[in-house]
Amino acid sequence: MTKEKVVLAYSGGLDTSIIIPWLKENYDLDVIAVCIDVGQDDDMEEVKKKAIKTGAVKVYVEDAKEEFVKDYVFKALKANALYEEKYMLGTSLARPLMAKKLVEIAHKEGAKYICHGCTGKGNDQVRFEVGIASFDPSIKIIAPWRIWDIKSREDAIDYAKEKGVEVPVTKKKIYSVDKNILHTSHEGGELEDPKNAHNKEMYSMVTPPEKAKDEPTYVDIYFNKGVPEKINGKEISPVELLNTLNKIGGENGVGVVDIVENRLVGMKSRGVYETPGGTILYEAHKDLESLTLDKLTLHCKQELAQKYGEIAYDGLWFTTLRESLDAFVDVTQENVTGTVKLKLYKGNIMNAGIDTKNALYDEGISSFGASELYSHKDAEGFIKLFSLPSKIKALKNK
């Protein structure tokens, strides 16, 4: 009799590695491991071998880097989306894409189940399951961390040893690490006590600023309607562009934040995020927008950037609201074209010049000299009208 199938979101890490024997033992399902490559820098052949060795009947490795950067990272970039003003959404943006790919493979394989290794306290369980439901609500979810008796990473390591599963962590130094082409996140371990400064030895993408290059690096980034297309005059693919900026930013100590964030599930958590290339792109994009967007549009867009960040963080990527915000953002980006030069030095990013034909800045108007469009005398009438509410309030308070 043919067994039913389960599609497992597989990384080769601790959680998903022990899930394979657990699924076979508790559900008697054929496990199809799926690794979505969004730039983790893992050896995918080794990941495949490990999945098979651990008990998977089949392994898919899907190269989704180009789609991830073009359709997720660059959309968030155009919106300047951040969560709680700091988090650049590295994990949040990857999960909807992974959910979409998992459903596609489940349909291809005729699998009724999808399994993920997200903990019952984290955001990713919501992101995966909302994403999956957006494409096929009939698929059944198996979430081991909400079911099994394993309560900690230490327990998980013990279970792995019991089942003969090799894992790349130890009980002495346990971090939860998520990596893709946009960022690397670090959680757990001593980070769980906010009194502790984080250990910079954990960095994998960024050189600590004090150890970074002693000479500044200059980089030119060309944007076409809000989308980065060239570095130092050379047009390159989105993946190559982000990889290049990751290297440049990392060498100059750029792009690390240590934050306490409000999780979707209601608790606070602390994370250290390395996002060198993304940090450079966001700074350059905002600099270009400061010249090319009018005040009303810029301020409205800044308000909506927070909402966009919340939508992405909460796993609501496949929603009408996100699509509607993208439509608004695309209109605002019509004139966001030009080259931004940045100076990078020991963790700092400084504007070193902007070249655009669409600048709304006019030196003749902004300077103290005479202008046909603006007379110094014009300010007097404007100030009288602008200050009228303040004058009325003062009179009423007498």
From Swiss-Prot:
Q: Where in the cell is it found?
A: Cytoplasm
Indicate yes or no for the key word Disulfide bond: no
Task: Fetch the PROSITE patterns from UniProt.
Answer: ARGININOSUCCIN_SYN_1, ARGININOSUCCIN_SYN_2
Q: Binding positions for L-citrulline? A: Y87, S92, N123, R127, S176, S185, E261, Y273
Q: Which Gene3D superfamilies match?
A: Argininosuccinate synthetase, chain A, domain 2, HUPs, Single helix bin
What keywords appear on the UniProt entry? Answer: Amino-acid biosynthesis, Arginine biosynthesis, ATP-binding, Cytoplasm, Ligase, Nucleotide-binding
Q: Which pathway features in its UniProt record? A: Amino-acid biosynthesis; L-arginine biosynthesis; L-arginine from L-ornithine and carbamoyl phosphate: step 2/3
Q: Sorted alphabetically, which CDD domains does this protein's record hold?
A: ASS
Enzyme Commission number(s) from the entry: 6.3.4.5
Query: Catalysed reaction per UniProt?
Result: L-citrulline + L-aspartate + ATP = 2-(N(omega)-L-arginino)succinate + AMP + diphosphate + H(+)
Provide the primary localization. cytoplasm
Under which main EC class is this enzyme filed? ligase
Q: Where does ATP bind?
A: A9, Y10, S11, G12, G13, L14, D15, T16, S17, G117
Please name the GO terms of the biological process aspect recorded for this protein, alphabetically. argininosuccinate metabolic process; L-arginine biosynthetic process; urea cycle
Residues holding L-aspartate: T119, N123, D124
Give GO MF terms, alphabetically. argininosuccinate synthase activity; ATP binding
Q: Which residues form a coiled coil?
A: none
Q: Which InterPro entries match?
A: Arginosuc_syn_C, Arginosuc_syn_N, Arginosuc_synth, Arginosuc_synth_CS, Arginosuc_synth_type_1_subfam, AS_cat/multimer_dom_body, Rossmann-like_a/b/a_fold
Top-level taxon of origin: Bacteria
**Entry GO terms, CC:** cytoplasm
Question: Which family, according to UniProt?
Answer: Belongs to the argininosuccinate synthase family. Type 1 subfamily.
- Give the record's subunit note: Homotetramer.
Instruction: Note the NCBIfam families from the entry.
Output: argG, PRK00509.1
Q: What is this protein called?
A: Argininosuccinate synthase
